């Protein structure tokens, strides 16, 4: 779907949502957020864009943990302003690569239409991979993405918005690179999240899944196109999105399985850490890309998702697993079951009610 069309659809969806709000809510002012936890708000084109509304807006922040300005999309339930004492569960939704929370993305209106829940889409960089990079001295600058999200964004949101700041009221999910990030954060911080979801996620980085590992390496080194195998599809993959290139060792050290030099990659493999998800609600969505225009990216990711399900099953850990194949029976938006926004949109239509029914309800 062309980017311009996505933006137009996002604007239209926002207008429709506002048109159906009660007058008092439609006129309500956007919450004022206070700097803190290492985050400083700055004015940017994204934070002042005319597409921002009082219930769906972008703020831009700076942090010593990550280089440059970072966008954070905040989506409030329609009754937020009209109920000043009501508190809400939160979904942290992690985008893919290369992408940006300020872009008009596939699930904006689904997330915006979710009653009783706050959704936060934090910047993960074009290829941040939701980790603190091993090498902090690359041309890309500071890249402590995990610190940024876990130690700064989450407490900033809890301090500024009426959240229910407990594990049982907090979910994390993501698409592609963001699916990897969601599982990684859930596994490393099980005390923070009670629900985790992956939409076409990169769920396996072990040595037996070298194709996906090398796709990550391609994004680091700025190989032409970087396979766009992790792409969420809302940014042109030919616009040098992965510049400047950095060394293949920058993220988790050597990615090459020689004399166990790649041990950090194996340690970061979500499949290898499946046991750490015990007790959480787990949701995995994947296609096979075999719906006409064959999408080999989703085929690779299908294998990773299947391995995750097999590992969870072997551990006796329940998982809601949707493999919709070529997408023919998944829903009208998923054409071909590929690595593309229509299928993720359909995934969110299924996922959001599941999260709402599992999280501590707004009250």
Language-model features: locations:
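Non-catalytic cap/lid and distal C-terminal segments of serine-dependent acyl enzymes
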Residues: 26-363
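Secretory targeting and sorting signals
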Residues: 1-29
